[in-house]
């Protein structure tokens, strides 16, 4: 009963101010209290992936914590993993506000934040100061390039982030798919993608052998370009693929006054598109690397659809904004019920189930 009233209050504030207030509250949660308040995750949801152990598939997508390292408070919500970022080598303010917009009727957001963060050095110091007791699961760091860095020099930015942040990350994610940094998505083109990911994978192997490196792809790639990106990424040495980022499409929200705002759309309108991209990545990867599903997950059924489409892990952000602090617990409990309903003993048994069913049916 508390969340509806709190949501009413927060949703009457500017979206970015509401985010700062919520994030600030989570930042102040001490590790001991976080462990006491953290909801139990059903044991059948445990996942082994990327050489790491997760107590469930549901994690926090990059974008919520941009380097403040509010680790304990975020794990207290029930997440199995938390992804920090996007972090750039040098501090940057991001785009001019207003830059975050709610489309409440559609349970969606449009953002053009622009990688606002304090930079890799500050983020590294903050992560170094996080006590071990606050880390209740894997912590990933999502990295990008500064807005002022031309694409031909982008690799240096990503390598600088890897060098500074890898000691504090259980895995790293190369973000080349945000629509809010001019020209960034061009790095998904074959030659640029291959060179960038080979450089990043090689550097991480030198600095921290065995540590996973993932790449985050856009949902707006053509089927052919998506297949090519998956192949190039795997050949370059990535350990997994995050599918997807926000979309430039406004399908389903065209008439909303905020639909005209520049930026990436997230939330419920992205769900079907993101799930289709997860499925295609899963088919193309053919078991070579795991897929992390992200985009439009607003309930347990949506998370389960991502898993059945091929996601081993699932990340959320906009669903948390609309669903509140009990959102992750509801996802986990709902997933356990859905697995049991369909006769799956573990998440791993359900991964790609819809793809395999379709293949057996000749679809």
Curated annotation (Swiss-Prot):
Its cofactor is FMN. InterPro entries: Aldolase_TIM, DHO_dehydrogenase, Dihydroorotate_DH_2, Dihydroorotate_DH_cat, Dihydroorotate_DH_CS. Substrate binds at residues 66, 111-115, 175, 180, 245-246. It comes from the Bacteria. The active site is at 178 (nucleophile). Signal peptide: none annotated. GO terms for biological process: 'de novo' pyrimidine nucleobase biosynthetic process; 'de novo' UMP biosynthetic process. Keywords: Cell membrane, Flavoprotein, FMN, Membrane, Oxidoreductase, Pyrimidine biosynthesis. Catalyzes the conversion of dihydroorotate to orotate with quinone as electron acceptor. PANTHER family: DIHYDROOROTATE DEHYDROGENASE (QUINONE), MITOCHONDRIAL, DIHYDROOROTATE DEHYDROGENASE (QUINONE), MITOCHONDRIAL-RELATED. HAMAP family: DHO_dh_type2. This is Dihydroorotate dehydrogenase (quinone). The lineage of its organism: Bacteria, Pseudomonadati, Myxococcota, Myxococcia, Myxococcales. The gene is pyrD.
């Amino acid at each position: 009963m508390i969340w509806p009233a709190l949501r009413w209050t927060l949703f009457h504030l500017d979206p970015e101010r509401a985010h700062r207030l919520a994030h600030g509250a989570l930042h102040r949660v001490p590790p001991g209290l976080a462990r006491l308040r953290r909801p139990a995750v059903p044991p059948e949801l445990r996942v082994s992936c990327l050489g790491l152990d997760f107590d469930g598939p549901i994690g926090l997508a990059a974008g919520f914590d941009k380097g403040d390292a509010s680790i304990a408070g975020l794990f207290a919500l029930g997440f199995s993993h938390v992804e920090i970022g996007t972090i750039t080598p040098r501090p940057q303010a991001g785009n001019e506000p207003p830059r975050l917009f709610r489309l409440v009727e559609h349970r969606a957001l449009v953002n053009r934040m622009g990688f606002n963060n304090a930079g890799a050095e500050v983020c590294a110091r903050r992560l170094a100061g996080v006590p071990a007791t606050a880390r209740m699961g894997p912590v990933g760091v999502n990295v990008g390039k500064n807005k002022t860095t031309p694409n031909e020099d982008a690799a240096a930015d990503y390598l600088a982030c890897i060098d500074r942040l890898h000691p504090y990350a259980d895995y790293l994610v190369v973000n080349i798919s945000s629509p809010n940094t001019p020209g960034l998505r061009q790095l998904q083109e074959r030659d640029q993608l291959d060179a960038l990911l080979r450089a990043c994978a090689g550097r991480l192997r030198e600095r921290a052998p065995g540590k996973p490196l993932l790449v985050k792809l856009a949902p707006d790639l053509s089927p052919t370009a998506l297949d090519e990106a998956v192949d190039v990424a795997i050949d370059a040495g990535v350990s997994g693929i995050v599918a997807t980022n926000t979309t430039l499409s406004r399908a389903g929200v065209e008439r909303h006054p905020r639909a005209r705002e520049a930026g990436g759309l997230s939330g419920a309108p992205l769900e079907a598109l993101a799930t289709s991209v997860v499925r295609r990545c899963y088919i193309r990867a053919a078991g070579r690397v795991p897929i992390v599903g992200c985009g439009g997950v607003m309930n347990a059924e949506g998370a389960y659809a991502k898993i059945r489409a091929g996601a081993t892990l699932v990340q959320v952000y906009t669903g948390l904004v609309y669903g509140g602090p009990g959102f992750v617990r509801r996802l986990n409990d709902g997933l356990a019920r859905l697995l049991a309903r369909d006769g799956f003993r573990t998440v791993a048994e359900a991964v790609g189930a819809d793809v395999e069913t379709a293949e057996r049916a000749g679809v």
